[in-house]
């Protein structure tokens, strides 16, 4: 149990069907506008103003899914907690359309990606105020086969002067960050004959700087293409789909030209992670059935490891977690967690959860990627909203040190030895990142200062974002910006 005098508010349980479908949904998020501190309008004209860096603010930008290093860890120091009776200062809020992805923040801009009235919408906001700088739209006809909304799931990525988006139906686009001017676009799902996954496209793009040859910056995405006649009669029978040489594809950021493609694995909802193993850059891509160890320079697959539940209606969505030469995979439908070593470009299994283990005694992540701190892994275990637990697990043994109920399938990031946790039901918590006990420093339901209504409505499935001392959190229909260092 956590040390806290406050009582958790209960959240509505999701239906059985929703539970089965859920897994894809988190790696994602969306965003819109209108602030409680200041109002911004969709009708503002696009601007070509040059992005301004918030260099006077502490810590770093957050230009991609799970931050600059893809592990959900912020370099911010001096987090001001507890927040006091009134909670943290809300700088601005903005309304959302459909979608499940969070913002990316860099150079003074926050880019948000959602769907409104049949169009996928990309907007660039001033990170400090929420003011709309520019907006671009694309028509979309994507329909989720399980009834979830049709907005984007994949988080935009800011790469230098560019922003790259990957829509739910597979439209990959690159635009100038300063004014939204289109640089190139590729209808990936059409060009590579992708059979739609249960929830569309969900894994976010990653960027890699080549060190040899042309030394291009590459955007690497999970594609999972198939033969042109590969569509099964029943669109839910994804077990009948075969891949064809485009599991992962790398494109030149500036031109959109394909640089390499590799593997016949199908796509998952797990965003790949770049890491250094024994002085070599490697990409860890947890595809639909296997984890791949890839040379990002060439796309060469060095090794693979199978880790997925046998159940047809299962997916993997959490990203791999890396510590030194070890990699942790965690899913909730089958085997749970496995710890691998990377030795000479080969995977070596070091431990796995015991057979028939349950989420109450092991780490079985649904979609939220756990964070590592002091040889402990913090995150949510469990498949269903009502019985999910927030836990601290030992990195090497998998043993649970403590567990806390009532937060649903929550997400977290690490900031200055603290965990900022966003519950599925909209509650915001700060916990001490300790194996000894779950010590809650502060918890709050954010309220609109004018109406008293909750700012974060469930479901809250996107991971928090921490950029330049600001915290960005989203619920259904709204993004909220909070100042973490305001005293």
Where are the regions that the model predicts?
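N-terminal secretory signal peptides that target proteins for export/translocation
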Residues: 1-17
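Positively charged, low-complexity intrinsically disordered regions
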Residues: 3, 17, 21, 39-42, ...
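Bacterial N-terminal signal peptides
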Residues: 18-33
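Noncatalytic, solvent-exposed loop/strand surfaces
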Residues: 33-487
